[in-house]
């Protein structure tokens, strides 16, 4: 009987064992960094009430109009697979009273879903790492988030391959004033606009500045600048932020058409971009969203955050040949040639794991000849092989072969293996 194979849904990819160690390294680097800064993890559902995203992201956005996975459940309620994390994080904070006269510094990690056209670096299920700081005013917290990003890039090895772009969206009344100016400009060039931009023109004209259509880039770059209509308070806030970046020694450039793709942003916004990934240039984006908590029924609460896609980070590290450097944890492969040797290998492996918790120990329990097992050992990336053959078992010795250097193979008593490893791997 021929049975059709079931394959993964387009744009939703499997992460196979050859890649998961690198993913784990990237994830653990993020987690370790945020813990050092005093941020705490929060977890919230993958599925939310559809109104959560319509109210926060904005109904006249590509995400809400075209990209959300929305469906009715068995009760007839409209629910949506989360397309981003900030809205769900804020909803959880309000629901559980985390913002009552409190400041929260939070991080989260997990899958998001958008029905976009799949391409390299952009998928329909993607993994996002997010950071949110709620209840804190001023530019110091914004500068802390930028500092976190810079440390992440340094820890991952590509700090010289990304650049920081910043802008200010000002207060809502300033955006409304700018909106009228921008609409007039765009109407004067209406014949140039694509259908998406024409549709956005009346309801959300700032979205036009977020267009990635190459035919519109000249028009966008020459559009009136929002920063030119900012009031004194917004200018002072943005200047304080820029001064702080200079004090911290963080290079940046002002991008006057940087508006972000979500409706809830105001004041400071930023993106980290790279020239290594073609059209997928943005690897991290964020900004201030002081009105979002109030949008969702909470008390007015200042807030700022950022998010980045792990697939995009993986792709950048792959492009820069950094993946091998990220997977350099020391490990040992134990070669055993028969059933008695395999049992000895299992006992030895547990002893090594007890004595050296940071060391990975791979035991070959499938048997096989020396040649095939050495191939497995080499492919595993292990630094050394411990060999338990018939001669070694008879003498209660273990042979040791360094797989990464030309050091000559040696044999030592089994009882001395932990002492040897302590000295050899120091």
Curated annotation (Swiss-Prot):
Enzymatic reactions: tRNA(His) + L-histidine + ATP = L-histidyl-tRNA(His) + AMP + diphosphate + H(+)
Keywords, sorted A to Z: Aminoacyl-tRNA synthetase, ATP-binding, Cytoplasm, Ligase, Nucleotide-binding, Protein biosynthesis
EC number per UniProt: 6.1.1.21
Classification via SUPFAM superfamilies: Class II aaRS ABD-related, Class II aaRS and biotin synthetases
Cellular localisation: Cytoplasm
GO molecular function: ATP binding; histidine-tRNA ligase activity
InterPro entries in the record: aa-tRNA-synth_II (IPR006195), aa-tRNA-synth_II/BPL/LPL (IPR045864), Anticodon-bd (IPR004154), Anticodon-bd_dom_sf (IPR036621), His-tRNA-ligase (IPR015807), HisRS-like_core (IPR041715), HisRS/HisZ (IPR004516), HisRS_anticodon (IPR033656)
GO cellular component: cytoplasm
Quaternary data: Homodimer.
Name of the protein in its database record: Histidine--tRNA ligase
């Amino acid at each position: 009987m021929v049975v059709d194979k079931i394959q993964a849904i387009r744009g939703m990819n499997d992460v196979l064992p050859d890649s998961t160690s690198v993913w784990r390294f990237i994830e653990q680097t993020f987690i370790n960094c945020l813990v050092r800064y005093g941020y705490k993890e929060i977890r919230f559902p993958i599925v939310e009430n559809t109104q959560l995203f319509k109210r926060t992201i904005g109904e006249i956005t590509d995400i809400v109009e075209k990209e959300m996975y929305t469906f009715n459940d068995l009760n007839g309620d409209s629910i949506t697979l989360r397309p981003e994390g900030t809205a769900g994080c804020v909803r959880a904070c309000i629901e559980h009273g985390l913002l009552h006269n409190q400041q929260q510094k939070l991080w989260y990690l997990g899958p998001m879903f958008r029905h976009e056209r799949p391409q390299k670096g952009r998928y329909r299920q993607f993994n996002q790492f997010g950071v949110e700081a709620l209840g804190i005013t001023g530019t110091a917290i914004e500068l802390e988030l930028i500092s976190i990003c810079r440390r992440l890039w340094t820890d991952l090895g590509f700090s010289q391959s990304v650049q920081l772009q910043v802008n200010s969206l000002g207060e809502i009344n300033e955006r409304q004033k700018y909106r009228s100016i921008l609409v007039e400009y765009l109407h004067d060039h209406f014949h140039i606009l694509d259908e998406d931009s024409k549709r956005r023109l009346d309801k959300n004209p700032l979205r036009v500045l977020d267009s990635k259509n190459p035919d519109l880039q000249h028009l966008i770059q020459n559009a009136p600048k929002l920063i030119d209509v900012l009031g004194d308070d917004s200018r002072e806030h943005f200047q304080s932020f820029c001064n702080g970046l200079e004090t911290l020694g963080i290079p940046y450039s002002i991008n006057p058409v940087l508006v972000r793709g979500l409706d809830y942003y105001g004041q400071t916004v930023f993106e980290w971009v790279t020239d290594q990934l073609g059209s997928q240039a943005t690897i991290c984006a964020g900004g201030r969203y002081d009105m979002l908590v109030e949008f969702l029924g909470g008390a007015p609460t200042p807030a700022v955050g950022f998010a980045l896609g792990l697939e995009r980070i993986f792709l950048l590290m792959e492009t820069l040949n950094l993946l091998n450097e990220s997977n350099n944890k020391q490990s040992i492969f134990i070669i055993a040639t028969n059933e008695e040797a395999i049992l000895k290998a299992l006992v030895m492996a547990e002893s090594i794991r007890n004595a050296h918790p940071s060391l990975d120990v791979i035991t070959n329990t499938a048997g096989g000849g020396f040649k095939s097992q050495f191939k497995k050992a080499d492919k595993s990336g292990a630094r050394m092989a411990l060999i338990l053959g018939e001669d070694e078992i008879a003498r209660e010795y273990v042979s040791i072969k360094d797989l990464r250097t030309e050091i000559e193979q040696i044999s030592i008593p089994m009882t001395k293996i932990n002492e040897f490893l302590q000295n050899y791997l120091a």
